[in-house]
Curated annotation (Swiss-Prot):
InterPro entries: PLipase_B-like, PLipase_B-like_dom1, PLipase_B-like_dom2, PLipase_B-like_dom3
EC assignment: 3.1.1.-
Organism of derivation: Rattus norvegicus (Rat)
Molecular function terms, GO-annotated: phospholipase activity
Protein name as it appears in the record: Putative phospholipase B-like 2
Membrane-spanning residues: none
Length: 585
């Protein structure tokens, strides 16, 4: 006879885990021809509890006699690298990763070790995040053979080109940092798969392994460039809001960001890295400028992806996605001569001391993928309670395929007292080249830089920001049922939960009428907020809240939502978390 249905919370979790494991097994079978996209389960999955403990620390040690690497529990000061994961997802919506490397060892070993220890403390979260987000990518149930083969070939060719460039330029700081980034990814994947083999020469990165977690943003543009039938971003799909606010009298400069993403991506980790890498491969090079950094991130991802970083160099770097709607530009997306955005992002954060240098590093080898508006705030140039320094406080960069435009916008920040970013290009040349004029002609002001709903809400409400708490309030704002700026005249019903600083597209009626897909009901919206200030950034800290906004709206609850059948392993059912000050010791 059939076993009785277990309707308890634990029973539902167990059924979800069994379903996920079955999917994982099937995915491994179907994807074996494409290099096996699903990584082998880590040793943590031999335990009964699918979630990590409240706290876990591990160190990677090098045995001097044998030359072997080994993982040990706890902190060991002579280790190559160490990491602690504090799992507070059920309490705050966040886990916290604190990772450090030992400058007594060479950079390459440090980088590999950083990946190893991160995977060793977060393997359960990595597995669940993989299952929630990318297990079906290129199979088993959404499998476009032609596209997946093209993607695999593109990534293999790009990895091979970068390996050649690293070999041709062994003394280059740029390529040294690219190599360290790939070694960190290699260590992450090796550790998760239960092997520790430090590569001394060339090394391989699986094109459809953990690289998929790093290139989530790049895929938004690789998909249309490689002619995928069903592409990731829908027309008008927003991906983040950001606000930089100069307070009256210049007594503070606040930087805030909220990420718009699928709700399946809500397994979150705030990470702190302390990396003792040198700028270049020789001992005489100084330490990288951005060797200390904190950022909002995801399991198995070695950069932010949101993106939001506080750097020890005094910079805060963040972006919102602008995309590309001009098919003629996809010709610039090629595997040779380009470095994917996720790597350029990391390298710029490591090497730059100011906004201009950051832009110079980032714009090299433009891939035309993960096309964003970047904001680089330099707190070193900001004078609290003082006049405008004239330049250097705010640098804006916009990238699309074949084009990168950069400008110092300090003067504009001091004139208007704010800079808002909401997925539409600021520079006219980028706006026109990316094909947005056609969308304005077809759909109206929704795609306009100055008349978009978020542009108007920011313009109306930015003056209400007085401190970090009121900044959080604005960045979580969504009163779509009552705010006239949230109305969509071509929609039925007209109030639309996408038209807010922090979207809640799950609240749009499923049976409504909408002019384009982004305005429909989706398991998508603003899933966090991060805010920093002069004082917070000085101590590498931020105020952060995880999950969809619930300030003016009912909190999101998986079990009561239209999307309760979506896989969301490891996530709380009810998302009703208040902001927390990130607790670094």
């Amino acid at each position: 006879m059939a076993a009785p249905m277990d309707r308890t919370h634990g029973g539902r979790a167990a059924r979800a885990l069994r379903r996920a494991l079955a999917l994982a097994s099937l995915a491994g079978l179907l994807l074996s021809g494409l290099a096996g996209a699903l990584p082998t389960l880590g040793p943590g999955w031999r335990r009964q509890n699918p979630e990590p403990p409240a706290s876990r620390t591990r160190s990677l040690l090098l045995d001097a006699a044998s030359g072997q690497l080994r993982l040990e529990y706890g902190f060991h000061p002579d280790a190559v690298a160490w990491a602690n994961l504090t799992n507070a997802i059920r309490e705050t919506g966040w886990a916290y990763l604190d990772l450090g490397t030992n400058g007594s060892y060479n950079d390459s070993l440090q980088a590999y070790a950083a990946g190893v220890v991160e995977a060793s403390v977060s393997e359960e979260l990595i597995y669940m995040h993989w299952m929630n987000t990318v297990v079906n990518y290129c199979g088993p149930f959404e499998y476009e053979v032609g596209y997946c083969e093209k993607l695999k070939s593109f990534l293999e060719a790009n990895l091979e080109w970068m390996q050649r460039e690293m070999e041709l330029s062994p003394d280059s700081p740029y390529w040294h940092q690219v190599r360290l980034t790939l070694l960190q990814l290699k260590g992450l994947e090796d550790s998760y798969e239960g092997r520790l083999t430090f590569p001394t020469g060339r090394f391989n990165i699986k094109p459809l392994g953990f690289l998929l977690l790093q290139i989530s943003g790049d895929l938004e543009d690789l998909e249309p460039a490689l002619n995928k039938t069903n592409t990731k971003p829908s027309v008008g799909s927003g991906s983040c809001s950001a606000l930089i606010k100069l307070l009256p009298g210049s007594h503070d400069l606040l930087v805030a960001h909220n990420t718009w993403n699928s709700y399946q991506n809500m397994l979150r980790i705030i990470k702190k890295y302390r990396l003792q890498f040198r700028e270049g491969p020789q001992e005489e090079y100084p330490l990288i400028a951005g060797n200390n950094l904190i950022f909002s991130s995801y399991p198995g991802t070695i950069f932010s992806g949101d993106d939001f970083y506080i750097l020890g160099s005094g910079l805060v770097t963040l972006e919102t996605t602008i995309g590309n709607k001009n098919p003629a530009l996809w010709k610039y997306v090629q595997p040779q001569g380009c470095v994917l955005e996720w790597i350029r992002n990391i390298v710029a954060n490591r090497l730059a001391l100011d906004g201009a240098t950051w832009a110079d590093v980032f714009r090299r080898f433009n891939s035309g993928t993960y096309n964003n508006q970047w904001m680089i705030v330099d707190y070193k140039a900001f004078i609290p309670n003082g006049p405008s320094p004239g330049s250097r406080v705010l640098t804006i960069l916009e990238q699309i395929p074949g084009m990168v435009v950069v400008a110092d916008k300090t003067a504009e920040l001091y004139k208007t007292t704010y800079w808002a970013s909401y997925n539409i290009p600021y520079f006219e040349s980028v706006f026109n080249a990316s094909g947005l004029q056609a969308l304005v002609a077809q759909y109206g002001d929704w795609f306009s830089y100055t008349r978009n709903p978020r542009a108007k809400i920011f313009q109306r409400d930015q003056s209400l920001v007085e401190d970090v708490d009121t900044m959080v309030r604005l960045m979580r704002y969504n009163d779509f049922l009552h705010d006239p700026l949230s109305l969509c005249e071509a929609c039925s019903p007209k109030p639309n939960a996408e038209n807010a600083i922090s979207a809640r597209s799950d609240l749009n009626p499923a049976n409504g009428s909408y002019p384009f897909q982004a305005l429909r009901q989706r398991a998508h919206g603003g899933i966090d907020v991060k805010v920093t200030s002069v004082a917070l950034a000085k101590y590498m800290s931020m105020l952060a809240a995880s999950g969809p906004t619930w300030d003016q709206l009912p909190p999101f609850q998986w079990s009561k939502s239209p999307f309760h059948n979506m896989l969301h392993m490891g996530q709380p059912d009810l998302w009703m978390f208040s902001p927390v000050k990130v607790p670094w010791d």
